[in-house]
Amino acid sequence: MGKIICLIIGYLFGCILTAEIVAKANNIDVREIDPESPHRGNPGMANIMLNVGFKQGLIVLFGDSLKAILAMLICYLIFKNNYYIYGGFGCILGHNFPFYRKFNGGKGVLVTIIWFIAIMPKYFWISLLVAAIVVAISGKLNLGAVTFPIVAVPIAYKYLGIETTILVVISAILMIIRNYKDLVCIYKGKYNRVDLRKIK
């Protein structure tokens, strides 16, 4: 029951889409941002940072990180054990599938990173390093997004046990699903390289 409660707590926090709030504060509908952008309509940090502004992107970075941290912290304070893992995982689900948006939210990249930092603080950097190298070589953020949870799977299996590993596997599958359309575009050669120097 405790795990279910933490999933619910995390889900509700995850449903708070900071990018949507920031976009509305700038009189922008995040779903209508640059339809030609590889991050079109995505209520996430990358979309805001690339198409609205760097400072606004930092606000999303802070907000999405905070909601994941608070979800896990509350779960830890309530149960005093590792159920916070489910709070963080629930936050990913809420961010990706908010009920008030017809279960169509963000891609959960930042929230997943924060979750990894919490559940594997000694090893998360390995996944991020590999993902960063992939992005640096390819210029495609989506490839990095799907790389880091995939790399995290064997790490979780070795150090975190089967239960947490299953959640990490699910997070990797979700990342692939949420980035599927862009991955198809990459495969077909229709996905342009992201120039980070163009951040406003």
Model-predicted segments: where are they?
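C-terminal ends of transmembrane helices
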Residues: 19-24, 94-103, 135-136, 180-184
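Alpha-helical transmembrane segments in multi-pass membrane proteins
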Residues: 2, 6, 10-11, 15, ...
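Loop-to-transmembrane alpha-helix initiation sites
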Residues: 125, 141-149, 159-171
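Cytosolic, membrane-interface loops and tails of multi-pass inner-membrane proteins
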Residues: 21-55, 184-200
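Interfacial segments of multi-pass membrane proteins
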Residues: 49-52, 75-79, 94, 109-138, ...
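RNase H-like, Mg2+-dependent phosphodiesterase core
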Residues: 137-146, 173, 178-185, 189-200
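Short, non-helical or kinked segments that cap or interrupt transmembrane helices
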Residues: 31-42, 100-111, 140-151
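Multi-pass membrane catalytic core of lipid/isoprenoid biosynthesis enzymes
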Residues: 44, 49-75
